Amino acid sequence: MEKINFHDIYKPGHTVLENELFFHNHNPDMLLQYDSNFISFKRMPSVQEFEEAHHYLRDFHQKYGQKHVRFYFPDGEELSGELLAFFQKDEDYTVGFLELFAILPANFPQVQEREEIIVENVTDETWNDYLEFQYEQDSVYGENFAEKKKAQHLRNYCDESILQLIAFYKGKAAGSVDVIIKERTAEIDGLMVHEDFQKKGIGSRLQKSVMDQFNDKTVILVADGEDTPKEMYRRQNYRYIGKQYNLLKVYK
């Protein structure tokens, strides 16, 4: 298996500033998306360095009407005691972590075919089904966010390096996943199953379709450290690669 780390994970947007301490990713098309507007530290900062980076990012985001700051810390490193103590002084800071998993497609378990589940690559014929499904899921974060995501989904549809899949259960849109295609990896992104159709094997069928179409690549994905699906990934023979701490603060 190829050596994989968090740098292989796709982040929409572009770098607007880079120095020896961090790089700053900005996504003007999705200002409301926390995970594509952030600072990622190359090394663990001191408290003073963090405060300076926080001040810079807050000022930058305010110019664009953004009401959050998001930080990622170096792969596989624990937060220092000084940083943790500093974060605990502000109850609006949320510390979390992501876990990175990878699998060779041949190691993915066999999935039983069920005729009521159909998985397809999104085409012009199924585009509206995909878009309506995504809009319903995105609306949880507000109508404004969902509208912005519609434009992003269209950009992704036109991007040859991104493949969108949709699953139908008895003819109804029931799940979806995007695949970020790179030279050596295929990244599973946004794997979702509608709450009305969970525990029917739809998520596994979506993943199996990815494995079948990209059997020459390492398939990777990121799971929130607090989410339960990561246990499912382990059962499906994904290999745990490592974790990365992050910090979020949302301003009112």
Predicted ranges, named:
Residues 78-93, 204, 226-243:
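Conserved active-site alpha-helix within GNAT-family acetyltransferase domains
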Residues 2-7, 44, 98, 104, ...:
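Short amphipathic alpha-helix that is part of the acyltransferase structural core
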Residues 50-57, 190-195, 199-213, 231, ...:
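Conserved acetyl-CoA-binding loop-helix of GNAT-fold acetyltransferases
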Residues 50-117, 247-249:
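Acyl-donor-binding surface of acyltransferase catalytic domains
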Residues 10-15, 65-67, 78-79, 154-165:
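A short helix-loop-beta-strand connector motif used in the catalytic cores of GNAT acetyltransferases and
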Residues 142-192:
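A conserved beta-strand-loop-helix scaffold within acyl/acetyltransferase catalytic domains
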Residues 64-74, 213-225:
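Conserved GNAT acetyl-CoA-binding A-motif
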Residues 1-64, 79-80, 148:
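N-terminal charged segments
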